[in-house]
Amino acid sequence: LLQIITGDATKGQNLIHHPCIADVHITGSIASHDRIVWGDDPRAQATQKLRGEPLLAKPITSELGNVSPWLIVPGRYTTRELESQAEHIAASITNNASFNCLATRVIVTWSGWPQRDLFLRTVERFLRQTPNRVAYYPGAADRYCRFAGRDGSLEPGQTFPWTLLSAQSIRERPELFTEESFACVCAETCLDSPTPEMFVQEAVSFANDCLAGTLCASITIPRDFQRNHPSGVRAALRDLRYTSLCVNQWSGLAYSLVSPPWGGYPGATLDNAGSGMGAVHNTYLLDRFEKSILTGPLVNYPRPVWFPSHRNALSTARHFIALYQKPSALRLPSLFWAALRG
């Protein structure tokens, strides 16, 4: 039985506590989770957590927020590689007007990387080329002003500019790293590591220890680094505490595949839920999983349909939906042709 009910927070609260409801799953923020489990008042939440007495006496699973990082391993990238990875990041920021838990919120680079400035300018160019979207999500105007550091008020329903804040420090702007903005704001921070090899280790530690969330992360790795430092690459992928890791790709791809598990990294508890407990998707019903790793090329062909620059995205999407409605090998040629024309 599936019944879809719409309404406000009060109706949601009534449904959660209804005697006919045995289990609860939510998608939202950690703040929403804690209000449901521990109560509305922050002081009462702390007391209930200390006592170990949740107000919700039902099992709950969750998929919560994430300050999703994209780590850029320094190297000598070709122009095509640099542009492709920059557009990947721009697409991850602009998709769904940036109202995604997997939107890139922090780009981590090496201060000694010669191509750093060029790369950031390329990301900004792709952002400028993407039309601004209506900030439809409740509270987006206030959050945008706060995280973008803009004074003044913005009206709900306005279009806000895609905003990349370069060279940000966690000491000066901790909110950019420890809170999910859920607005079209992305911060870039650079680490002063002595070598590229040390940067990879320190970037992994920075993502694990300084950024909020464990849901998903992406890392761009040049081919020469993978060839010359295979053990360093394996260690980085092993040590990153994220359930979904994507190499050279946006983590939205792992989400859209549906088969990999999607949720917070193992170890979350009811009083420290992080990016959530439990998982969705997981088509193969894997048990006791830790993470999934998806790898891809530095340059995708054909052009990903989620890139704003894709010239035939709408037609490709329609062919894709038609394939899902009536699966048939006869529908594949038209889908491939639409995608190739992007």
Listing of model-derived features with the role each one plays in the protein:
Residues 1-10:
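PLP-dependent aminotransferase-like
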Residues 8, 27, 110, 220, ...:
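Conserved residues at the C-terminal ends of beta-strands
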Residues 12-13, 204:
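Short hydrophobic/charged patches on amphipathic alpha-helices used for structural packing
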Residues 17-23, 31-172, 197, 247, ...:
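ALDH superfamily catalytic-core signature
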Residues 156-165, 174-188, 210-216, 244:
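Conserved glycine-rich beta-strand-loop-beta hairpin in the small C-terminal domain of fold type I
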Residues 200-311:
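C-terminal core of ALDH-fold dehydrogenases
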